[in-house]
C-alpha cells in the first residue's frame, strides 16, 4: 500500500494548516542549519586528520611512553634473606624425602 502523489499532497496541506507555513519555514531553516553545521564539523575533523598524517603523526596509534632512566627498586636485605631461607628449607625438604 504505497502513497501516491495525491495522498502526499493532502497530508502536506493538513500539516501546513495545522502548523502554519511560517512555523514550517522556521523548522526547515533550523534543520538545514543543523545539517550544515554537522557537515562543516565533519569536514574540519577530516582536515585535522589529514594534517596529522602529513606531519607524521597517527591518531590510531597510541603515543609512546617516555623512557624513565630510574633503576628498578632493589629488594631489601630482609626480603632477600627470607627468600634465601625459604629456598634452603625447600631444598632441605626435598633432599630428606
UniProtKB/Swiss-Prot annotation:
Disulfide pairings: none
Q: Kindly list the places in or outside the cell where this protein is found, as annotated in its UniProt entry.
A: Cell inner membrane
Against InterPro entries, the record matches this protein to: TatA/B/E, TatA/E
Which Pfam families does the UniProt record give?
TatA_B_E
Q: How does it sit in the membrane?
A: Single-pass membrane protein
Where are the membrane-spanning stretches?
Answer: 1-21
Protein's UniProt keywords contain DNA-binding? no
Enumerate the GO terms in the molecular function aspect: protein transmembrane transporter activity
**Disordered: region residues:** 28-97
- One cellular component term from this protein's GO annotations in UniProt: TAT protein transport complex
Sorted keywords for this record are: Cell inner membrane, Cell membrane, Membrane, Protein transport, Translocation, Transmembrane, Transmembrane helix, Transport
Q: Where is the composition biased (Low complexity)?
A: 78-87
Q: Biological process (GO) annotations?
A: protein transport by the Tat complex
Q: Does the keyword Transmembrane apply?
A: yes
Basic and acidic residues composition-biased segments: 37-56, 88-97
Q: What does this protein do?
A: Part of the twin-arginine translocation (Tat) system that transports large folded proteins containing a characteristic twin-arginine motif in their signal peptide across membranes. TatA could form the protein-conducting channel of the Tat system.
- Describe the family membership recorded for this protein in Swiss-Prot or TrEMBL: Belongs to the TatA/E family.
Q: Which HAMAP family match?
A: TatA_E
Q: How does it assemble?
A: The Tat system comprises two distinct complexes: a TatABC complex, containing multiple copies of TatA, TatB and TatC subunits, and a separate TatA complex, containing only TatA subunits. Substrates initially bind to the TatABC complex, which probably triggers association of the separate TatA complex to form the active translocon.
State the protein's name: Sec-independent protein translocase protein TatA
Record gene name: tatA
Amino acid at each position: 500500500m504505497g502513497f501516491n502523489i495525491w495522498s502526499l499532497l493532502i497530508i502536506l496541506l493538513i500539516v501546513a494548516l495545522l502548523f502554519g507555513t511560517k512555523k514550517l519555514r522556521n523548522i526547515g531553516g533550523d534543520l538545514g542549519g543543523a545539517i550544515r553545521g554537522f557537515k562543516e564539523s565533519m569536514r574540519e575533523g577530516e582536515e585535522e586528520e589529514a594534517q596529522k598524517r602529513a606531519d607524521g603523526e597517527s591518531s590510531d596509534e597510541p603515543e609512546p611512553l617516555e623512557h624513565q632512566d630510574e633503576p628498578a627498586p632493589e629488594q631489601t636485605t630482609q626480603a632477600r634473606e627470607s627468600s634465601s631461607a625459604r629456598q634452603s628449607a625447600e631444598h632441605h625438604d626435598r633432599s630428606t624425602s
